């Protein structure tokens, strides 16, 4: 059996801050796609960097997108998922660009120079706890 718990907005932000890779959901024309992306948080925005001229960079411009993160802890059989939905826009604010530039980045993505922020308007999350089923000995013996 699985117990399900809805998470409040504050806990969703806390969980977002614990991971560095998420899944970006957006449209390429009429086709929806899910793309794994590294990200960081800055001023209640999700910030991603992409390569100038890349298809994902074009699709991110002034779109409404979804961003999802999750994690699973084997030791306590707990999983969680957070989904944020909001508009994406190029980062042009010098303060934000400087802050993002100083953040640690994955070496594989250092050459990406297009910075986009997603400003979540909706954020929700769930925690799932897998409970070990208990088997009644009376039921086992009655077969």
Q: Which residues are covered by each model-predicted region?
A:
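Short, basic/aromatic recognition patches
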Residues: 1-23
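Short, charged, intrinsically disordered terminal tails
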Residues: 6, 124-143
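Short solvent-exposed loop/turn micro-motifs enriched in small/polar/acidic residues
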Residues: 17-19, 31-33, 81, 109-111
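Short, surface-exposed beta-strand-loop junctions and turns on beta-sheet-rich folds
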Residues: 30, 54-56, 132
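General beta-strand recognition
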Residues: 45-47, 117, 124
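Short, structured beta-strand-loop surface elements
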Residues: 52-114, 120-122
């Amino acid at each position: 059996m699985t117990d399900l718990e809805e998470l409040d907005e504050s806990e969703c932000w806390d969980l977002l801050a614990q991971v560095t890779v998420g899944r970006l959901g957006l449209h390429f024309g009429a086709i929806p796609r899910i793309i794994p992306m590294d990200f960081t948080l800055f001023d209640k925005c999700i910030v991603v960097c992409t390569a100038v001229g890349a298809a994902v960079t074009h699709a991110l411009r002034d779109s409404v997108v979804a961003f999802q993160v999750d994690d699973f802890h084997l030791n306590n059989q707990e999983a969680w998922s957070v989904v944020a939905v909001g508009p994406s826009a190029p980062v042009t604010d010098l303060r934000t660009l400087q802050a993002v530039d100083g953040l640690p980045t994955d070496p594989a993505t250092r050459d990406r120079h297009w910075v986009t922020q997603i400003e979540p308007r909706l954020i929700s999350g769930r925690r799932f706890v897998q409970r070990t089923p208990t088997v009644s000995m009376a039921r086992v013996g009655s077969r």
